[in-house]
Amino acid sequence: MSDLRFRCLVDNDFCDIAPFEPYIEKGSSDMGLALIAFDESELDTIKSLLNETQLEGSDGYLYILSQGSVEKKGKMPHSVMKAYRYYKRYKKKQNRAAAHIERELSHSGDGIRKVSGGRFSAYKYTDQENKICFPFRLRASKNKNEPLFILLHGAGAMGSDNLKQLFDNLPLYKQLIKTDCNILLPQAPFGSNRGEAMQNYIKSIKRLVDELPADFDRKRIYIIGTSFGGCCAWQLIYLFPEYFAAAVPVMGGLCLDRDYEKYDIGRLVKTPIWAAHSSDDTNVRIDSDDYCAAELEKLGADIKCTRWDKYGHTMSGKFYRTENWTEWCLSKKLK
């Protein structure tokens, strides 16, 4: 029994009680349900946080955690065992990504390295200060002093192939292609959608923009983010007020832990924001956007909200196709 591990899914109420620690692993997309996995030696830590809970054992049986003890039940369905295999693959992929970053940091200096040319030129960026490296694509305008659009992808496009983020942002190109502008598409390393790794990635995006090999208008930098990218967009304008001319976070959120009092919402006042979300989104809940919008309206900020009640965590495509977010962004400029 010493190798027996348990798995269960919990929602954000659990995350409010216990921040992510080594024994709590996140396997779902973005910030909705959290996948936690732990072994018997960690039960004392877990049982104080959960009441009666159904656990899935690595031996193929269901267990019930009740009043501090675990009771073995019947066999698990095949779908649950499949989820276990997914979890193992997830961890291996995460470990490989961490090892890749470590190798890159040890062999590369700070800054930008061009990999290939073309319409969307491929680059690699190494940030020794924040201990991260990642690829990005840049479509530079032929003209000087044009605006810069930063497109931040969802969690599904994380990796190091420098391709997934292109496909993830396809609905946005169809709008931006009509505009003479610079387009930056960073690709977040696998596993950088939480904790310190996420903060390092966010800070590195700002450093990358400062060092970009493109002559663009620094008073017209616009940040567009989808899902995980929407969360990053909120964080960027919170950490660096008066740097971005406007932000469009879609299906994202700033206060995902719902500890609203620790956030100084006034930091967002000087950045025009168009937040888009769906009330039936179960991956990234709308609570944070609702809270930030209400507080920013009280402060007289330039805040616009698109709040739908259907489409769930798939509303971004329709939003980008049907709303005039491009024109709205271009109407904003830093003073």
State where each predicted segment sits.
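Gly/Ser-rich "nucleophile elbow"/oxyanion-hole loop immediately N-terminal to the catalytic nucleophile
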Residues: N193-S227
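C-terminal catalytic histidine-bearing segment of alpha/beta-hydrolase fold enzymes
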Residues: A276, T282-K335
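Short glycine-/aliphatic-rich beta-strand segments at the starts of folded cytosolic domains
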Residues: S2-D11
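Active-site machinery of serine-nucleophile hydrolases
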Residues: L148, L152-K203
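Primarily recognizes the serine-hydrolase "nucleophile elbow" in alpha/beta-hydrolase
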Residues: K219-G266
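Short, proline-enriched alpha-helix->beta-strand connector loops that line the catalytic pocket
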Residues: T179, L268-I273
